[in-house]
């Protein structure tokens, strides 16, 4: 099905295999930011369409909590799905069915561990 599952992202227009900085797999937020802010009028066959988005049918990422956008559910921009809903902070843990896009969420993680501050320290 040519989907990619990666923690954060990648910056190489040739894909993660050609990534110059391997730390981008864990830290890159440009893929998410680009997908969310893309001009919807740019068609996939346009020379302006980002090449790295054409490499996969869908790309599933985390690392950038949707809470940064005041959203508590998975977000989609182009073919990029961000399913990090902030469980490391005060959000919920989320899983998604990649075929149907149905998703399930826990209660806020801190309700299970009230004494644990997580990344909210």
Predicted regions and their residues:
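Acidic, His/Gly-enriched loop-helix segments that form or flank divalent-metal centers
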Residues: 1-81, 86-91, 98, 102-109, ...
